[in-house]
Every structure is written in structure tokens, then in C-alpha cells.
Amino acid sequence: MVHDSTDDPDDTRVRKSRRGTALDAPPQETAPPDLDPATTGGDDEDDALLPDILEESGAVGEEPLASGHEAIERAVRLAPTSPGVYRMLNANADVLYVGKAKNVKKRLSNYARQSAPQPARILRMIAATVTVEIVSTNTETEALLLEANLIKQLRPRFNVQLRDDKSFPYILITGDHWAPQILKHRGAQTRPGRYFGPFASAGAVNRTITALQRAFLIRSCTDSFFESRSRPCLLYQIRRCAGPCTREIDFPGYTTLVREATDFLSGKSHAVKQELAGEMEKAANELEFETAALYRDRLAALSAIQSQQGINPRTVEEADVFAIHQEGGFSCVEVFFFRTGQNWGNRAYFPRAEKTFTPEEVLGSFLAQFYDDKPPPKNILLSHEIEESELLANALSIKAGHKIEVTAPKRGEKKELVAHALTNAREALGRKLADTATQGRLLDAMATTLSLPHAPKRIEVYDNSHIQGTNAVGAMIVAGPDGFVKNQYRKFNIKSEGLTPGDDYGMMREVLERRFKRLINPPEEGAKVKDDDFPQWPDLVIIDGGRGQLNAVREIFANLGLTQVSLMSVAKGPDRDAGRETLFMPEREAIKLEPRDPVLYFIQRLRDEAHRFVIGSHRKLRKKDIREAGLQEIPGIGPSRKRALLHHFGTLKEIERASIADLGKVPGVSAESARRIFEYFHPQPG
């Protein structure tokens, strides 16, 4: 979708049930991206997950079933005959199911009839129901939107759940500066400018922006960097920016470049390419071969964008295409995004649903949740007819302020797009099923090797990072039956003031106490939930270190009263060689595995992923401090050398990128000063 900036979208949120949340199972990190190979889809955001199947248990007992019917009958007596949303809750106040109805009393009466035949899934839900809560709405469309919002927030066990629900990135060409900037944008579209999207992934946006810079030479630097320039930056030298900061291009010329880029993203690619081709031919005829070569390179960059996009439909201007494939009790929904006649990528989703749900039921519930916080396009194309397509179209039309069509095309190019998406869904689910089976065997082997009571479903790995105690941060990663679950990674900025700089034990103590106290003492009803709140107990906790670190964590666990969580530490081998690690567990001898043991390789991957994540978190903190402090914090760098460095390189970012040799070329900067500057920007964190 292409549009100017808008007001903040409705940010209404519903409190999540503390007990009834079924959190996602993790993705396999090495799984092939669930993308059309011919598109610029989200290979770097492939966090699609396979959920646990909710297995059907045996026959439902007559007594709990009768009790559930009685609870629903009580609700029927008070239920309105108007539209609304109802929630079924169990004895722990967990939300089991969220539903909507045009006539709530009539819908609940269907559940209350004991003689009516019901699927086993519905009978289990009724048997667990203790109370029913009802919210009346003015219209059925309002009920549909509220139902989708509640399902996303409460994650009821018996509903279809959209789980990997990241916001989509857009390309923004700013409108609040005389020299507009091009950048990636997520979230509320409040900054003035033109927004182009959604794109399937950050990777798709980054590649497109890089190609657009080559084609249209639009700046990507921030306004503060722009204003501080005294000479063009490196991007100007490599022909990815026109250099408006130092007036290498005048205002009319830069405005023309911005207009061409906007036209290209708005679907006028053919006209833009024709214009550039005409300018190239004109320059060649006038023997301006260097200028002609510049136009040639710009045309090549535009062709590269279009070649990456794969399918670009002729008759579909704006649409999202949804195709669902089911196999082995799992569902995969593949989504393609088409805007301005261009393919802006695709993404695979693996919604959580009982295996008795039909493709139509899964897809219908998925769509309502998908567009709960996203602007819908004019056309939504489906692989299957859903029951309430007209109601969904009306609800989305009201929300968007323009007509939305929801159809399952039977012929023509739209049908071809759906068929292509269905092929991708089938292939993505096949890959994910294979990866899940492999991961399951690996976890079984891990349980056998480490003598765990069962194959771990949730593994948490902890690490911390700092430089002489500064910018100290701890981190936790999570893995399980499907690999790494990145949406449950957490970082912990170390807050304890009494810690000795570099006290790794103290940092780990703070991290673990903050993590597990949340599980031991859940927040009160209505309490604000913080980033490190998530109610799942791990089966195995892994830390980096030897027997000393293990004993320190055992003491922390003992003080917290934790006895049921398995604990292991991983000590690096001699010379930090991979494959020579030693594993330590409480009350056991040290464990040495063969270097080629798949379990050891898996443990190495877990440790390395935790290290990667914590180092990345540490570097973000350090870069923030560097931006705020500038060069003042570097020993021996006074005002005169600071001015010389900024005059030579232009910005702090360019100084950070410079090598020791480049730094040594600055007048007044000695070899020792160059080394100190380089080490300041490129430290080795602990």
C-alpha cells in the first residue's frame, strides 16, 4: 500500500490471561526460508513456527460435561439476543475459547443443548467451562473485530491462533526536510512523508533501499548527520547518494530524483525506465559517455529490483494473497503482498489450531486476526471459500474507510496467483515438518545423553557481556522442539548498583532472579507486564562456564527454592577449541562427548546463539553511549584532535569505520592515538 503518513492506529489492548497463555514453539534456525525463491521475501525474518498439536484425549466424563452444560445454561439465561462476544473460562479463570455471534443467546443455546451431537473438541471445551463472560456490541462486524483482538491477546486454547505476528516494514521517503531521506520504517506512520509497503521482511526492504539508492541516489543518513557534513560521505564516492548535504546537487535536481523514486515505488516503473533510457541515449548522442554510463547503471539497478520480485501481475494492482495447506495435523498459510502491481514479498505462517479444524475454519479465523492491526489492501484473494467472507469484507471496509473485496478466484490471473501461493504453502509446510522431525530426534538423544527425565520442550541459555563492567547486559535465548524461538529471547540490562565491575556471578544472579521470581510470584491482576514476564518454566537451563559457575547458579536456585529445573554448564575446551567442551551437571562427574556427537554440536549451537545475542545487545548499548558521548571519552583525544578527526572523516560513523592506518593519516594523530581510537570503537567484550 502506498500512502502519506496517517494518525496513530487504534492501540486498544486487552489484558492477557496469566494462566491461559500457550506460548509459541520455536523455529528451526537453519530451516530454508519459507519464500518463493524468485521473490525478495523475508529470509532474514523466517521465524515461522510449528505449534504443538492439541491432541484429543479420551472420552469426556459425564460429570464434567454436565457441569459445563449447566454453566453455559446459566449464561444463556442472562445472554442478550443482540450481537456480541463471549468468553468461556475454566476453574483457573483461563480463557478457553472466544467466540462471536449475531445473536449471543442463540449461539450459547447451541452449546447448552445436551442432546445435540458435538465434535470431541467442543465437548472437551464444554466440560472444562466453569463460567461464561459476555460483551455486547452494536453490530456483528464490531463483534468480529473484537473477537479477533481478544483471540490475539488472550490466546485461548480452543481457538485458531495467529502466532508469528510481527509488524511489517515499510519504505519511507520523508517529507519534513528539503532533501528527503529514504529509510526502513515500522510502527505508527506519524512522520510526514510517503510510505510504501508492506514488505514481507526487513531483508526485502533493505535490499530494495540499496537498489533504489543506486538508481536514484537518495540519501539514507539521518538529519543530524546531514546537517553536520562538511564534505560528501563514502556513499557519494560509491555513487549511492547525490550528495545534497554539501550541495553536490542542487535542489531542483534532487527533487527530480525523489520524484522518480516515488513514481517507481508507486507503480510507474515503466515510465521511469523510459525516461532514464531517453536521458542515457541523449547523453550518448552528445558524446557525454560518463553521464550515459551513470544512467546505464541506474537502469541496471531498477532492473535488479524487478528481477528479484519474481511474479509481477498484469491485472492485479493491490492485493494480499492467502493460501492454506494442511498436512500431518498442521496448517501453513502462505501470504503474498502485491502493491502498485509489484510483488513485495511473501511469508509463511503456521497458526496453532486443533487438527479437527478444516482449512476454511483456520483461514477464516486467521484473516480476522491478521488484519487486527494492519491496513488491508483493496483485494484479498483466498485459496478456499470462507464461511463469513462478506462479513469480514464489511468489517475491514469499515476499518479501512474504503471498499475491501474478499474472494476465492476461480479463473484468470488471480487464480494463478492463488495457485502459486498454494504451491509455496505446500513446500513450506513440507520443509517445516521435516525439520521438526529432525529436531525431535535430537532432543530425544539429548535427554538420553544427559539423563534428563524427558526430552526438553523448553531450553533456556543464559550469558552476559560487559567491558570492564560497563554497558553490562545479560541475555536469555530459548529453544525447543522446532529450534530457536526468537520472539521469546530477552535481554536484561544490569541494574544492580553494588556490583563490582566485571562481577560475572553477580550479573548472572540478577538475571536469574529477575527471570524466575516472575514465575514464582506472578503479577497481580491488572498489574503492568514487563518485558521479562512470560509464564513458562524451562525444562533445562544452560549457562556458560565450568563447575564454579554451575555451583554459583545452584546456590541462586536454592535461594529461590527451585528444585525441578535441570541445570547444566558448558566449559570451553583447551585453547577454546570447539568440540573439546566439558559439560557439568549437579551431583555428576564431568561429561565429555565425542567431537562429532550431534548432541555436542547442538549444545555448541545453543551456547553460540546465546553469545551472539548477548554480544549484539551489548554493542547496541555501547553504540548508544558512544553516540551520546562522542569522542570525549577516549583517553588522550582532546578538542584539537577531535576537530581534526571530524574534519578529516566528516562524521563519527566514518571515524568508527576507519582502520588504524586511516586514523594515523589524520594530522596530529599519532600511531598510539590511532590504536586507542580504533580499540575504543572495536573493543573485545567479556
UniProtKB/Swiss-Prot annotation:
Keywords annotated in UniProt: Cytoplasm, DNA damage, DNA excision, DNA repair, Excision nuclease, SOS response
GO biological process: DNA damage response; nucleotide-excision repair; SOS response
GO MF annotation: an example: DNA binding
Main location: cytoplasm
Residues covered by the UVR domain: 270-305
GO CC terms, sorted: cytoplasm; excinuclease repair complex
Pfam families: GIY-YIG (PF01541), HHH_5 (PF14520), UVR (PF02151), UvrC_RNaseH (PF22920), UvrC_RNaseH_dom (PF08459)
Ranges where the GIY-YIG domain occurs: 81-160
Record's subcellular location: Cytoplasm
SMART domains xrefs: GIYc, HhH1
Domain of life of the organism encoding this protein: Bacteria
Bias kind Basic and acidic residues: ranges: 1-14
Assigned protein family: Belongs to the UvrC family.
HAMAP family in the record: UvrC
Subunit structure and binding partners: Interacts with UvrB in an incision complex.
PANTHER family named in the record: UVRABC SYSTEM PROTEIN C, UVRC/OXIDOREDUCTASE
Reported function: The UvrABC repair system catalyzes the recognition and processing of DNA lesions. UvrC both incises the 5' and 3' sides of the lesion. The N-terminal half is responsible for the 3' incision and the C-terminal half is responsible for the 5' incision.
Protein known as: UvrABC system protein C
Organism, scientific name: Bradyrhizobium diazoefficiens (strain JCM 10833 / BCRC 13528 / IAM 13628 / NBRC 14792 / USDA 110)
